Amino acid sequence: MKQIQDLTSIYARKKPAEFADNLCLFFCYNFCKGKIFKDEKEAFDAAEKARLDGFLGDDGFVLNAEAILREGNCFRWSVQKEKISAIGDVKKASPVCFEYNGRAHWVVVENGEIVFNSLENSVCVKNGKPVSMRIIRQLDL
């Protein structure tokens, strides 16, 4: 089965090609806050809204992680960057970046296992190494 990022590219034809290619961290943040898109149209519409709101760049890269996490709920969030070299110590669901040959892809890791990947097949995950993660904290309980 194709994953959500593979499918959203059909809606991105009028946008720069890299817009859909670079949405992996956006999808990871949504997964971490409990948002599961019902289909690729809903996912693309959410990404386009985030772009128009200034939370994503025209290239699909995340500009404001806290705002993406806050969208659709009343909580405030904190996101901290941390370098890593292995996923075994990642306990709480967190976006993790894998790099391979100058390319990067984000997945969600929990308890040392990948629990969400917006792509069906990622060369970065398959052949690359984890290099950084985002630690997400909900500030309002």
Spell out what each predicted region is.
Residues M1, D140-L141:
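Short intrinsically disordered terminal tails
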Residues K33-D140:
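Conserved active-site-adjacent core of cysteine acyl-enzyme catalytic domains
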Residues M1-F55:
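Active-site-adjacent structural segments surrounding the nucleophilic cysteine of cysteine proteases
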